[in-house]
Amino acid sequence: MKVDPNKEKALAAVLSQIEKQFGKGSIMKLGEDRSMDVETISTGSLSLDVALGAGGLPMGRIVEIYGPESSGKTTLTLEVIAAAQREGKTCAFIDAEHALDPIYAKKLGVDIDNLLCSQPDTGEQALEICDALTRSGAVDVIVVDSVAALTPKAEIEGEIGDSHMGLAARMMSQAMRKLAGNLKQSNTLLIFINQIRMKIGVMFGNPETTTGGNALKFYASVRLDIRRTGAIKDGDEVVGNETRVKVVKNKVAAPFKQAEFQILYGQGINRTGELVDLGVAHKLIEKAGAWYSYKGDKIGQGRANAGKYLTENPAIAAEIDKTLRELLLSNPSALASSASDDESTEGNIDLETGEIF
């Protein structure tokens, strides 16, 4: 198709004028001078990284993680911070709930000496701190825990029982408009933890909703629904949770995938257990009876012992992790088949044998 030369000249002139006024890169053709691959940070769970499609949470975007109480929301964000710090990135934690446990964070691998932490007095203060950190361009990951605890100043200064209809939603809506562009410019990942509330009078459909209005739902590139699906027992003692995360919204890859993993109390995500399960599912690790083998060498009797071997041999664990990422991220449907197989195995797991009961 022939293009009018006068239109081409006019377009070139206006593009030149826009770039002169707003800076180079302020407007461009979609396929030109930019990386089409989104930079990501690992969530600490291999199966969740694969379910997200891009290999982790996307930089320069807003992410919402929500779920019931004690489902692993804060643990998941601390795992993301630990993964980011291992890559040399700077992280900040906005603790609006005033409930961050530094000892637990340290156990999960977070470098608490280099983690920026703020406990703001009001919701506006928390969001202003987020915006200032973002505009600095020096912070790579910001976590806000939680949206429900971002209390507007008017509500704090008022009395208990006063009506403040829509204040939090209006505050969040204004913050999202301001933050979204700045996050993209500075390539900062902003994670909001959110709580669940019940809508009154819902007869059909899901009565669950998240706090803070609808703005966050629209601006978030990724929304994760995290749930506790069972307990992990060592004998009679409960030592962790079976956890399922569903990717409810995803703007960087296909949504609606889900991942299942274990969160062990005081340790975080059971990475080696995940490697054993996915390794067996994709024929990287051989299983004969209760024995697990890798490249012909026995690595342990029972899932727990195989996981312990990988913990003691990080080079082998890293090799299996790398192979699985290459396999699953190039072929995400492979995980879907293994996840559907895993769905029938809900329940309690004996740490010694790895058996479901």
From Swiss-Prot:
Family: Belongs to the RecA family.
Domain of life from the UniProt record: Bacteria
Lineage of source species: Bacteria, Pseudomonadati, Pseudomonadota, Gammaproteobacteria, Alteromonadales
The keyword Ubl conjugation belongs to this UniProt entry's keyword annotation: no
Main subcellular localisation: cytoplasm
Protein name: Protein RecA
Keyword tags: ATP-binding, Cytoplasm, DNA damage, DNA recombination, DNA repair, DNA-binding, Nucleotide-binding, SOS response
Gene Ontology cellular component list: cytosol
SMART domains: AAA
Record: residues binding ATP: 67-74
